[in-house]
A protein has these predicted regions:
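Residue-level marker for buried hydrophobic side chains located in beta-strands
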Residues: 50-52, 81, 105, 187-189, ...
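A short, structured active-site edge motif that brings together acidic residues
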Residues: 106-113, 118
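Active-site metal-binding motif and surrounding structural segment of the metallo-beta-lactamase
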Residues: 61-107
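Internal alpha/beta domain cores that form substrate/cofactor-binding pockets in large enzymes
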Residues: 216-233, 238, 246-286
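Metallo-beta-lactamase
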Residues: 4-10, 56-58, 115-171, 175-239, ...
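C-terminal regulatory/interaction regions
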Residues: 2, 265-344
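Conserved beta-strand hairpin/beta-sheet module of binuclear metal-dependent hydrolase folds
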Residues: 14-70, 180-192, 196
Length: 344
């Protein structure tokens, strides 16, 4: 995958993939992986700004260009808020904070230490991808001075020129995840906790979303509880990192909960499949999502659907495997196969 090209800080709005969404909120396409895959959201209120998720280090020039295009200086940013510390959301945070003299970083207490000293987070990434590929995808991750980091405990309220932003603990996708409820618009910035919804899968203005079960902290039951907590806020819209604004929130929330339960069922079906476990989960997950997309009315050909899901299916399957392994560690003695149990 290629890194987005740097953008001049003087670039006009028309030259940037910057979309106004309403209520002083803008979506910036980071260019990570492909277009309309990864969004950085900016909020502007009375000349002050907040940035929700940063994408990777490669996106920082675009974020600074977006601020300039909106008539803002780097010193006008009060908050950089991370929904969680996966690097497609937080990889650029340290580099961006170095360019924003007035900003403070807001992050879940479990993620704060990884932003202050990202060495373990970065090493784990390099262990998975190799250093060269990790740098190509994310760039290096810069540390942030602890004095500039605010731990987002559940219920913490931030203010942006008097506009209240409430941070809400949101485990299930990751234990270091928060969502942010903007009380002015009623909208919720959900990161990955309200799933993934690619605009290519929209049908007649109706979005399709599916859960993100990225390893290694996917917890299906907990994720459903987090979805319920967001639904209880009765938001008119929810903003996802992948990709941006969705409406018809109750319908999408019900779909996400149903599919989260199906993810768990697929995992349990193949829990004792040995060396075939991951491959079987991956195949069933691909079939599930393809079937759901057809039922939604998506008419893209199979090759295009597979291409759009090419990162998510293996990653989500790995997350289901991580969940199964965590269950096994908590209950090390597996149940004996019975008449209705899957064969080992």
């Amino acid at each position: 995958m290629t890194s987005p090209m740097p953008v001049s800080s003087a670039a006009p709005v028309a030259a940037l993939p910057l979309a106004p969404l309403g209520h002083g909120i803008f979506a910036l396409d980071s260019g990570y992986v492909r277009t309309r895959f990864d969004a950085v959201h900016l909020m502007v209120e009375a000349g002050r700004a907040a940035i929700i998720d940063t994408s990777t280090r490669h996106c920082v020039p675009q974020i600074l260009a977006a601020l300039a295009a909106l008539g803002l200086e780097p010193a006008d940013v009060d908050w950089v808020i991370l929904t969680h510390v996966h690097l497609d959301h937080a990889g650029g945070a340290g580099t961006l904070m170095a360019a924003l003299p007035s900003a403070r970083l807001v992050v879940h207490p479990r993620g704060a230490r990884h932003m202050i000293d990202p060495s373990k987070l970065w090493q784990a990434t390099c262990d998975v991808y190799g250093t060269a590929e990790a740098e190509q995808m994310y760039g290096r991750v810069d540390p942030i001075d602890a004095s500039r980091v605010v731990e987002a405990t559940d219920g913490l309220v931030l203010t942006l020129a008097g506009r209240r932003l409430r941070c809400i603990d949101a485990p299930g996708h990751a234990r270091h995840h928060i969502v942010i409820h903007d009380e002015a618009s009623g909208w919720v910035f959900a990161g990955d906790s309200f799933g993934i919804s690619y605009r290519e899968f929209d049908v007649a203005g109706r979005a399709f979303a599916f859960p993100s079960s990225t390893p290694v902290q996917f917890e299906p039951e907990v994720l459903c509880q987090t979805i319920d907590r967001m639904l209880a806020l009765n938001p008119e819209a929810i903003l996802l990192t992948h990709y941006s604004l969705v409406r018809d929130v109750p319908r999408i929330g019900a779909t996400l909960k149903r599919l989260t339960q199906r993810y768990a069922q697929i995992g349990l079906l193949h829990e004792h499949a040995g060396t075939e476990r991951t491959a079987r989960i991956r195949a069933d997950l691909a079939h599930l999502l393809s079937t759901e997309l057809r039922a939604h009315g998506v008419t893209l050909d199979d090759a295009r659907v597979s291409e759009l899901l090419s990162l998510d299916v293996p990653l989500n399957a790995d997350g289901i495997v991580s969940w199964l392994d965590a269950r096994s560690r908590r209950s090390p003695t597996p149940p004996q196969p019975g008449p209705s149990s899957p064969s080992p």
